[in-house]
A protein has these predicted regions:
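Gram-negative bacterial Sec-dependent N-terminal signal peptides
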Residues: 2-22
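Solvent-exposed, acidic/polar segments of extracytosolic/periplasmic ligand-binding ectodomains
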Residues: 28, 282, 360-425
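Extracytoplasmic "Venus flytrap"
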Residues: 31-55, 59, 83-89, 112-113, ...
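Periplasmic-binding protein-like
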Residues: 32, 99-112, 132-134, 178-183, ...
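Beta-alpha junction/loop-to-helix N-cap segments that form part of ligand/metal-binding clefts
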Residues: 43-47, 62-144, 153, 215-223, ...
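Extracellular/periplasmic Venus flytrap/periplasmic-binding protein
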Residues: 94, 139-142, 147-255, 294-304, ...
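Extracellular/periplasmic periplasmic-binding protein-like sensory domains
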Residues: 253-326, 336-342, 397-424
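Short, charged, surface-exposed loops that flank catalytic or proteolytic processing sites
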Residues: 336-354
Length: 425
């Protein structure tokens, strides 16, 4: 009788206990932050949101090619909670706290603005919330502080600036006497120009800075800056403008002849090259912040992603879309590596962090290596080309690629020091 009662109790307990896989199958809540309103929404935020929606839907439906064919993250379905990145950094800090403390998301993936990343990173550390920056470019994130809970799966502005300098030196056959800059007056624009100027002085000794213009972010009107740059008559003009500022700059600078007077570098120009094709003359140097968009490799993941995105939204994915997809896939790779190390059980945040550090993973843009910033900062190759209109369609010509180790500093070395030391490893 004792045995029977014990058996009944055991069977009853088993009947009402949650299945062993329930914790594993509980959905993961991901806070996704990008611009959904304002001047940065159309060229950056909306494409990034669209990419996030595709990735979440397709991962949940096991429709992503290998090595990401497993459902969600390690079998757990993904739930996305969108937050608008518009507004000052103080607003973004409040929204981040809401995601972490009120909504109890498992992780946050987001942020286009370098200012927002700088503001959010210490809060992520304070709240011990796994946070993956997908786009913002300032190298200051991991140069000025060390973070346990923060990762960035896209390269920094240093890569863009060094790559641009290497490209334009070759394009101009070394015949560059003067350079000028028009960049937004905050972390991204400042860092981009500092690294480009320093790189040019290494690659073209004796080059002079004709002028450096730093209008405020989202200023919208740039006639005064354009007049100054035209008057400076620089051989090369560098701009890291993005969002609506980039589009406004193109529309204002083109009719005034800036693109014909100087070789102009638009390090984020890919986001405007299709929309403003008729306003961009041949020969403008176009960047995409890495091997994205027209510079993306011909691999299975890219063929799948670019077709899926274009079929759904009617336009090709721009680099913001690629970077969002890259962040989600990188986080999935880290999660599943941690899960495997945990015997197939749902990993802890510490386990995911350990797996993420120094991780190498594949993306639609090719190989991504988390090897600087103590293993929290990605490096990738990059590419540049010049605009060329072919049968009414904007393309890039004279494409040059630069390996990741050629355009990114080694781990533990600040970008400024690396450049000043002649890019030595």
């Amino acid at each position: 009788m004792y045995f029977v009662n014990k058996l009944v109790i055991a069977m009853t307990a088993a009947a009402f206990a949650p299945p062993a896989s329930l914790a594993q199958e509980a959905p993961l809540k991901i806070g996704v932050v990008t611009f959904l309103s304002g001047p940065a929404a159309s060229p950056f935020g909306v494409p990034a949101r669209n990419a996030a929606e595709i990735m979440v839907e397709m991962l949940n439906g096991t429709k992503v090619p290998a090595p990401y064919a497993a459902r969600g993250f390690g079998g757990a379905a993904l739930q996305m909670q969108l937050v608008d990145e518009s507004g000052p950094a103080t607003t973004q800090v409040t929204e981040f706290r809401n995601l972490a403390q009120r909504d109890n998301v498992d992780m946050v993936i987001g942020y286009v603005s370098s200012g927002n990343c700088l503001a959010v990173a210490p809060v992520a550390e304070e709240l011990k919330k796994l946070t993956v920056f997908f786009d913002c470019g300032t190298p200051r994130i991991f140069e000025e502080k060390s973070y346990k809970y923060v990762f960035r799966t896209a390269s920094t502005a240093t890569m863009d600036s060094v790559g641009a300098a290497l490209y334009v030196k070759e394009l101009k056959a070394g015949k560059i006497k003067s350079i000028a800059g028009v960049n937004q007056n905050y972390a991204w624009g400042q860092d981009s120009w500092v690294d480009f100027e320093a790189s040019m002085k290494q690659l073209a000794p004796g080059v002079q800075v004709a002028t450096s213009q730093m209008p405020k972010l989202f200023a919208g009107q740039y006639n005064a800056e354009i007049s100054t740059v035209l008057g400076a008559k620089a051989d090369v003009v560098h701009s890291s403008f993005w969002d609506g500022d980039l589009e406004a700059f193109i529309l204002q600078a083109g009719p005034r002849g800036l693109f014909k007077r100087s070789t102009v570098i638009l390090t984020t120009g890919e986001t405007a090259m299709y929309k403003l094709a008729e306003h961009i003359p041949d020969g403008v140097v176009i960047g995409a912040r890495g091997p994205y968009g027209p510079y993306a490799p011909d691999n299975e993941l890219n063929r799948w992603f670019s077709k899926t995105f274009a079929d759904r939204y009617g336009v090709p994915p721009n680099y913001a879309a690629y970077q969002m997809a890259q962040a989600i896939l990188g986080t999935k790779a880290a999660w599943e590596k941690a899960q495997a190390a945990n015997g197939g059980k749902r990993p802890s945040t510490d386990g995911v962090i350990a797996a993420f550090e120094r991780l190498t993973f594949e993306s639609p843009a090719g190989k991504v290596e988390m090897v600087i910033g103590a293993g929290h900062q990605a490096i990738t190759e990059t590419a540049y080309g010049v605009s060329k209109l072919v049968k009414g369609k904007m393309t890039v010509a004279n494409v040059k690629r630069y390996p990741a180790t050629m355009v990114n500093p080694p781990d533990g070395v600040k970008a400024a020091d690396w450049i000043a030391n002649g890019f030595k490893k």
